[in-house]
Amino acid sequence: MDKTGIAVWDPVVIPQKRCAMWRFPLRSIWVERIETEWHVLSLPEARDRGDASYRIVARSQKPPSSEWRHYLHRDSGTMQPSPVLPDKPVVMRPDRALTLLPGQSTIFFLELPVWFRLSTSGYHAARVFEEPLSVLTRTWFGDPVTGELCWGLATRLHHSVESVEPAADRAVCPLMIENDSDTDLEFQKICLHVENLSIFRGKRLLWTNSLHAVFKGPDQATQMEIVHAPPGFEDDMVPVSNARMPSTGWNIRRTFGMLKYFTDF
């Protein structure tokens, strides 16, 4: 059955000697099943393909390429595609510079790129492979000694979820920030440790955990809380992928460094 939108993340059964094709705006994923072998090919799209889609095609339609990868797994049948967040922090460059005045709070909805993960199901379930779906650039965040390697991309700051267009290759992160200081909080770069976030699936959008940041000033600890329940912006959300590095409760030390760097203090 052909699928579009976030339905491309439904479990699938790939028949023997057939190919499954997931097509995203900037990348297509091909998976062929032959006996206990899984053949996988990831190709960049020459142009934006628009909405995501999934379908089963004949082997004769698979692209000729030397880049096919081959995996062995004795279980067969149902495969689980999953959206997962990148393996490094993401530095986001907003489309405009904003300043949060002292004593004020705001919420933004940020669109984070997701990766494609394919796993087998059954008793011997295993991860087969992961692949980025967007073009990300490597960037260094922080000073030369204590900084870290990140993924970088430009983004738009949404004030309401209604302005976010549904997309199967992006997850929405609600970020609430309180400026509990007497200092202006300037937004020039936003660094998010996405490896601490899970992904949930709603009826319209993919979501991450909500983040709640309390800024105390450039020389004081800043608090960041990861809300582990699904965000309350859609009904009947279900978890689809866990955080790579789960974090619990309020995070003081790491949060201060993140906010200190991304606001250029």
Label the predicted regions.
Residues 1-265:
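Interface-prone segments of viral and bacterial extracellular assemblies
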